[in-house]
């Protein structure tokens, strides 16, 4: 089942579809408790960015903070949160531009999805090096 989700995600025809397949359980929870409530009051783009940011922070970055604080260290820069915001912006942009990769081979689609993730995380890591 997990392998199937990963395979479907990386061969998805759009970046938005990638995230629908990536983690169905997180996707359901985030849609129900984050995206939909925000979407009722604000534009879709704000709901998408907010949902990706919440996922990055609460389901990824925040999990490391208690251990760092217990060790007397500062919490880490929220690299995943910022990377997910970049990914959200890519999802919004590719949807607005109607980017569709149906005609591409599955391996090419997988490479494009990996490139998007790599660029988002590279941008976030670079941002983490600035003295905030």
What is each residue range found by the language model?
Residues 63-77:
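Interfacial helix-loop-helix junctions of multi-pass membrane proteins
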Residues 87-101:
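Transmembrane alpha-helical segments of integral membrane proteins
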Residues 1-61, 103-132:
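Membrane-interfacial catalytic/cofactor-binding modules of polytopic membrane enzymes
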Residues 41, 77-78:
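A generic membrane alpha-helix/interface feature
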Residues 52, 79-87:
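Hydrophobic core segments of alpha-helical transmembrane domains in multi-pass membrane proteins
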